[in-house]
Amino acid sequence: MSRIYFILCLLGLVCVACQPATNTSTGKNTAGFNIEIQNDSTTITIYSPWQKGEVMQQLLFSQPYERIVCTSATHLGFISELGMTDKVVGVCRPERVYNLSEEDRDRITDIGDDMQPNMEKILMLNPDLVILYTYAQGDPIPAQVEALGIPILYCNEWTETTPLARAEWIRVFGAVFGCQTKADSVFASVCDAYGRMRVMGDGQLAMGKSIMSGMSWRGTWYVPAGGTFMGNLFRDAGAQYKYEDNPSTASIPLTMEQAIQDFAQADIWVGCEANSLKELEAIDQKHTWFKAYQAEQVYNFRRRALPSGANDFWESATVHPERVLQDLQKVLKGDTTGLYYMLPLR
């Protein structure tokens, strides 16, 4: 019996040893994706941002991708952080991309507008992957790309409502390029820095500084609800915000009169689209009625912007929300030195 028992145990060990090595990684801050690595095969599962738990796509591959087409400048924020811009062969409106070297700009092909990419140009580039964002269910662009016989990958980071959830999508790009360890390291560093600053934000609440966002455009003023990306940033920065307790993940449309009622006495004004106080007044003279305007405490996110319209805020800030958080905490304390993305209007 002892010999039979020994042989059975030995066979059991062999069977266990022969099982394929599997490493499954789900998002820590997001339910938007899952990455499974089994031996030399990687599977990225993307979940629908509109139907919770519903699989939107699965991408299975055995080699890192070498020729990438991107439809959003935000994708370049992740790719640049990983040092992989040399893998990009096409992008929508490259003049609107901040994180490209002159060499990259000469080499990369413009594939047209992100809402209607040029399929002929994409086909001629012979990419092995097209990274897409989808703006709605039933978006026709993914089917058009797949009809060319080219694999696609949905990048839905823009639907995430918390800063760390958006930043975590760098792990998807790490899997695509075969540099998962580097992507995990970047994200861990971001989480650590953001967590430390969020604790500082808790302390700043006692200062009682209030914040407002956006501006009036054609009669409507959109402000972030408390459950949005920016609403969460305001909370983590330690700012008092009128709609911080509104759990919606959508923007709230206000009339100018409502905005004045809600924010006339706000201390800090961020995220307006004007480049100067004079321009802000020209858009609507009532902008001058706000305390923040009168105190010259108005900021946009254009410190790292180019005349072409490229703006690093839409790229690296997605990867590094701790930099945005630090900017917000600085201006709440009246400190404008060393701001990374924010620029005071004068």
Language model: regions and residue ranges:
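Bacterial Sec-dependent N-terminal signal peptides
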Residues: 1-26
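Bacterial Sec-exported substrate-binding components of ABC uptake systems
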Residues: 18-76, 182-212, 278-281, 294, ...
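A short, structured surface patch at a secondary-structure boundary
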Residues: 46-53, 61-124, 129-135
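Second-shell loop/turn segments in exported
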Residues: 64-67, 78, 107-113, 129-132, ...
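Structured C-terminal subdomain patch of bacterial secreted/periplasmic proteins
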Residues: 66-67, 160-185, 271-346
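Soluble non-cytosolic domains of exported or imported proteins
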Residues: 69, 113-117, 135-139, 160-167, ...
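Extracytoplasmic ligand-binding site segments that recognize negatively charged/polar headgroups
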Residues: 94-99, 138-141, 156-171, 208-232
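Flexible, glycine-rich surface segments
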Residues: 199-284
